[in-house]
């Protein structure tokens, strides 16, 4: 995996639809050892100092410590959720309301009762199976509802939305100053 080889310590797999398409995701991150049951071998990459730590115990430990997250965002993934979260090596799950709403014929309706119920189902199932759920929020005030459900991991904002908000606010302030002069 290029991300792991670049030194990234966590991977989010998006769009799994069925157990068949998802069953090998975490094994691609884990070391190819009898204990980890992974398929990630050694190579000349940044995560191993290009040569110095190739195949070392530290290399294996780093792969074992990497966080493997799965984005559940299709109707078929929600229907197969328990089996998908039972795949060895999955550490975290995140629900994707935008893609999910499209997959059930409700594009853009992230707050539709069916979408909200699917998200709750993902959170409850993850907690029951010992998988950490993660929620996407835009602002800290959105966290309380998730904390009440047992969620303690969050993705707050996205790089493009953070930049857009900054440019809109700061650019607007500059525009006002230029207009006043």
Regions found by a protein language model. Give the residues of each.
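Expand to "…catalyze enediolate/carbanion chemistry for C-C bond making/breaking, isomerization
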Residues: 1-181
């Amino acid at each position: 995996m290029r991300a792991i080889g670049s030194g990234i310590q966590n991977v989010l797999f998006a769009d799994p639809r069925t157990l068949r398409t998802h069953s090998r995701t975490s094994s691609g991150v884990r070391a190819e050892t009898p204990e980890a049951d992974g398929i990630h071998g050694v190579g000349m990459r940044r995560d191993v100092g290009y040569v110095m730590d190739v195949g070392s115990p530290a290399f294996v430990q780093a792969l074992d410590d990497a966080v493997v997250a799965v984005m559940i965002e299709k109707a078929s993934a929600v229907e197969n959720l328990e089996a998908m979260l039972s795949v060895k090596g999955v550490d975290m799950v995140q629900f994707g309301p935008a893609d999910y709403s499209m997959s059930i014929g409700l594009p853009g309706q992230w707050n539709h009762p069916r979408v909200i119920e699917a998200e709750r189902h993902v959170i409850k199932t993850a907690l029951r199976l010992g998988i950490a759920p993660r929620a996407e929020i835009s602002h800290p005030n959105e966290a309380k509802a998730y904390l009440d459900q047992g969620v303690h991991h969050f993705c707050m904002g996205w790089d493009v939305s953070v930049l857009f908000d900054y440019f809109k606010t700061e650019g607007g302030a500059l525009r006002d100053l230029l207009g006043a002069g």
